Curated annotation (Swiss-Prot):
Cellular localization per UniProt: Cytoplasm
Example of a GO biological process term: regulation of DNA-templated transcription
Protein name stated in the entry: Probable transcriptional regulatory protein lpl1249
Species lineage: Bacteria, Pseudomonadati, Pseudomonadota, Gammaproteobacteria, Legionellales
Pfam families linked: TACO1_YebC_N (PF20772), Transcrip_reg (PF01709)
Native species: Legionella pneumophila (strain Lens)
Keyword annotations from UniProtKB, A to Z: Cytoplasm, DNA-binding, Transcription, Transcription regulation
Length: 247
């Protein structure tokens, strides 16, 4: 479990750095627009939109920018029609990788994703080739200075499937359908949540060598830098040495 949460923290910090450069804003606006188009502009009844808005606020996006993206989504007529796509493949060392995209041009997107895999020792697979190795779940991360017994009791009572304390962090895993119930229960109890999101979580992590990790990180970075890519997931278990070097 520690491998999951540490990697999530690294991705979170990288996301904040990217946001300062303006790189991530395009992806966030795209996700907000699509979420509003699919489920309406009311955050209280649209979990996907609520999560997208939270990510945008965490990246210091202005509320006016967020509201405009929601309006475009609800209006539906303006802008390109974005389609959600998922690509599956293998990275260096046979690591399973999922790539979630939003794009208005499938041919462009698959070409760019395939190129990234090929350039860094991986290969694009077929639908279903690795997705069975992942489960869609909610992940909530909290600082360990929160009252652990209280956190555990509230989370489990609200429907969490697992709660663990690793290093300086409490990690809570939920089924998708219980994610917002658990999150709201924690927040209603005035407990501080550091990060929360729906994710594709590897059922089993695969240990990889540091050499393989370096190649894999280059692949993941290249995929995440593509405009059409929203999220990248893998089942790699990185060594403490690699995780520390990325902090």
């Amino acid at each position: 479990m520690a491998g999951h949460s540490k990697w999530a923290n690294i991705k979170f910090r990288k996301g904040v750095q990217d946001a300062k450069r303006g790189k991530i804003f395009t992806k966030l606006i795209r996700e907000i627009t699509v979420a509003a188009r699919m489920g309406g502009g009311d955050e209280s009844s649209n979990p996907r939109l609520r999560d997208a808005v939270k990510k945008a606020l965490n990246a210091n996006m202005k509320r006016d920018t967020i509201d405009n993206a929601v309006k475009r989504g609800v209006g539906g007529a303006d802008g390109e029609a974005m389609i959600a796509m998922r690509y599956e493949g293998y990275g260096p060392g046979g690591v399973a990788i999922l790539v979630d995209c939003l794009s208005d041009n499938k041919n462009r997107t698959v070409s760019e994703v395939r190129h990234a895999f090929s350039k860094h020792g991986g290969n694009l697979g077929t639908d279903g080739s690795v997705s069975y190795l992942f489960t869609n779940q909610g992940e909530i991360l909290m600082a360990s200075n929160q009252p652990e017994d209280k956190v555990m009791e509230i989370a489990i009572d609200a429907g969490a499937s697992d709660v663990a304390v690793e290093d300086s962090q409490i990690e809570i895993i939920t089924p998708v359908e219980a994610y917002h119930t658990v999150l709201n229960a924690l927040q209603d109890a005035a407990l501080e949540v550091e990060q929360s999101h729906l994710t594709m979580r590897a059922q089993t992590l695969v240990p990889i060598s540091d050499e393989t990790a370096e190649s894999l990180i280059k692949l993941i970075d290249m995929l995440e830098d593509l405009d059409d890519v929203q999220e990248v997931y893998s089942n790699a278990e990185f060594s403490e040495k690699i995780l520390e070097s990325m902090n």
